């Protein structure tokens, strides 16, 4: 028995060490199988961490869990699963989330991790000195009386030597009523760890915005804006954060919010990406048109109107076609909507882009439209004006037409696609410049990286895509910090700095430090979605945590969800369900 246990500890440590070394070398692989039904994954710093909902931890950790079942196996599990189980529901047979291990199995794995790191276990066949591995956390199925949902182990090191380990137990319950006293929690911590004094730290999270599905056919976006506030000491349970707290806005924005004020601009960006993909791959997947008329009809009408005006006035004329592209955003704060409206100074090429991007559905449309335009220029029917600074092929032809001579352009191959892509890029760049400079959020120097014409056209499109995401972030935050210009400016600079150094990432959470006094109206009269107190003394690893939240922080467990019989006529719950988390720990000294 002991020999088998020793071998298990050696093997477990060896597998974890291999994974850790691969990560340090930048080799990222899928979770590895430790046993037939057990897998281990290494969560790097900055990656989504399931423990963040409980401990606010975001460092590198090992996560141990049950191997997800193949879809065909889920039907068999359904038959075996009892009604009382808290393990994730397999009823759909799809999108099965993280799965938990029995509490007993989790304790065994924590024991192997502890054995392997104990310097007193000299009989183990492990190369010395033992490498201190990242913390190990095991998902548990809450099958014990305490409702354990996580077990964790974190090493204590002194001068690069492993001197002990902290063992964590996390429990979670769904309650309609909860009763807890801060002094009782402090006394529990003192008694458990033989302490005379303790420190308490409060934390509250207020959900300012979270997108919801419009209907059954449109899924909710991943946009979420939350205000996190921490302070010390915490004086009572559910204390309102004092103005001396530290506050941070956590912002994650997915572009293309259907109800957002930028929906029309996002549609133009999508069309730009379609053209860029077509130019790169030779295959173009056209968007559904927004116009009832064909692209050729719209362009011909546009040229006829310009001809009647003898080529003048087209830039100042209010373009009703462009106006129709504006999305109805009645649900969005009107003042925010007014900040980003279609520019009134669109030149010929920009108006042409608006018409063609909303109506072109084929390569033939492109060829026919540009044929009409070039013929009108050659005949001298129109002499449209353009903004300065454009290097597009169409702008060169227009400038040549002023002098009565034009280069011959063969509208074949990728040329029509590139021509429309160029004028779209010019138009969108000017849109973004107009907003950022108009709102005094950035200068041309700040934006130079995003609008530089010196890089190849695919890179230009990619950078414009980044710039659009920055704009989406700002517009999403404006309802909350619009009156605080310095906050909007700071957020702009944070985003610009990030995207000059990193690829586009709409899952990235941007963090904006704020003064509680500047956002007190957002939280002082509101209930937090999450409230937590941490009690510790000396080593911050040794702590007791109590948390209350209005949604389950445990992604591998299902809790009771109310059915329709429990809902009132207006759809609200008579009694709200709360989730209480408790984290306790014990310290083991090796030396």
UniProtKB/Swiss-Prot annotation:
One of its GO terms (biological process) is protein localization to kinetochore. The keyword Phosphoprotein applies. It is found in: Chromosome, Centromere, Kinetochore. Keywords: Cell cycle, Cell division, Centromere, Chromosome, Kinetochore, Mitosis, Phosphoprotein. InterPro entries: Zwilch. The modification Phosphoserine is found at residue 88. GO terms for cellular component: RZZ complex. Component of the RZZ complex composed of KNTC1/ROD, ZW10 and ZWILCH; in the complex interacts directly with KNTC1/ROD. Essential component of the mitotic checkpoint, which prevents cells from prematurely exiting mitosis. Required for the assembly of the dynein-dynactin and MAD1-MAD2 complexes onto kinetochores. Its function related to the spindle assembly machinery is proposed to depend on its association in the mitotic RZZ complex. Belongs to the ZWILCH family. This is Protein zwilch homolog. It comes from Pongo abelii (Sumatran orangutan). The lineage of its organism: Eukaryota, Metazoa, Chordata, Craniata, Vertebrata.
């Amino acid at each position: 028995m002991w020999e088998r246990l020793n071998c298990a500890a050696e093997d477990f440590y060896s597998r974890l060490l291999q994974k850790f070394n691969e990560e340090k070398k930048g080799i990222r692989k899928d979770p590895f199988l430790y046993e037939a039904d057990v897998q281990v994954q290494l969560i790097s710093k900055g990656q989504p961490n399931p423990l963040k909902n409980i401990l606010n931890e975001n460092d590198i950790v090992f996560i141990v869990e049950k191997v997800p079942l193949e879809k065909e196996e889920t039907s068999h599990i359904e038959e075996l699963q009892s009604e009382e189980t808290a393990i994730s529901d397999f009823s759909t047979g799809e999108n099965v989330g993280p799965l938990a291990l029995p509490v007993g199995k989790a304790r065994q794995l924590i024991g192997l991790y502890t054995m392997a790191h104990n310097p007193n276990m000299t009989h183990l066949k492990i190369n010395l000195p033992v490498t201190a591995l990242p913390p190990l956390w095991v998902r548990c199925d809450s099958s014990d009386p305490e409702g354990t949902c996580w077990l964790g182990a974190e090493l204590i090191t002194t001068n690069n030597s492993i001197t002990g380990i902290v063992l964590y137990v996390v429990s979670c319950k769904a309650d309609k009523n909860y009763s807890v006293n801060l002094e009782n929690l402090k006394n529990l911590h003192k008694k458990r760890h033989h302490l005379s004094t303790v420190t308490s730290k409060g934390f509250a999270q207020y959900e300012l915005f979270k997108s919801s599905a419009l209907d059954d056919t449109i899924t909710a976006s991943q946009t979420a804006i939350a205000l996190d506030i921490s302070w010390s000491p915490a004086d009572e349970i559910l204390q309102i954060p004092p103005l001396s707290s530290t506050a941070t806005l956590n912002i994650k924005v997915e572009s293309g919010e259907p109800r957002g004020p930028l929906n029309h601009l996002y549609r133009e960006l999508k069309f730009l990406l379609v053209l860029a993909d077509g130019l790169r791959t030779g295959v173009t997947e056209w968007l559904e048109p927004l116009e009832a008329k064909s692209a050729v009809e719209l362009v011909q009408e546009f040229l006829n109107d310009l001809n009647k005006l003898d080529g003048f006035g087209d830039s100042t004329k209010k373009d009703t076609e462009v106006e129709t592209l504006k999305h109805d955003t009645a649900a969005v704060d009107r003042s925010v909507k007014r900040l980003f409206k279609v520019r009134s100074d669109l030149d010929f090429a920009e108006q042409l882009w608006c018409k063609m991007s909303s109506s072109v559905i084929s390569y033939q449309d492109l060829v026919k439209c540009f044929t009409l335009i070039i013929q009108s220029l050659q005949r001298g029917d129109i002499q449209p004006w353009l903004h300065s600074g454009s290097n597009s092929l169409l702008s060169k032809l227009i400038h040549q037409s002023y002098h009565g001579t034009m280069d011959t352009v063969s509208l074949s191959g990728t040329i029509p696609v590139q021509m429309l892509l160029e004028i779209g890029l010019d138009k969108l760049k000017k849109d973004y410049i107009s907003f950022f400079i108009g709102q005094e959020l950035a200068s041309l120097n700040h934006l130079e990286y995003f609008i530089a014409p010196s890089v190849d056209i695919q890179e230009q499109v990619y950078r414009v895509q980044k710039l659009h995401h920055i704009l989406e972030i700002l517009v999403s935050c404006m309802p909350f910090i619009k009156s605080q210009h310095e906050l909007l400016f700071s957020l702009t600079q944070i985003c610009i700095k990030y995207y000059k150094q990193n690829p586009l990432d709409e899952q990235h959470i941007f963090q904006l430090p704020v003064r509680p006094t500047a956002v007190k109206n957002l939280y002082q009269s509101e209930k937090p979605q999450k409230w937590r107190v941490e009690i510790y003394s000396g080593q911050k690893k040794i702590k007791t945590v109590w948390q209350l939240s209005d949604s389950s922080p445990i992604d591998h467990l299902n809790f009771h969800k109310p059915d329709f019989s429990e809902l009132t006529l207006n759809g609200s719950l008579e009694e709200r369900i709360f989730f209480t988390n408790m984290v306790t720990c014990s310290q083991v000294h090796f030396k």
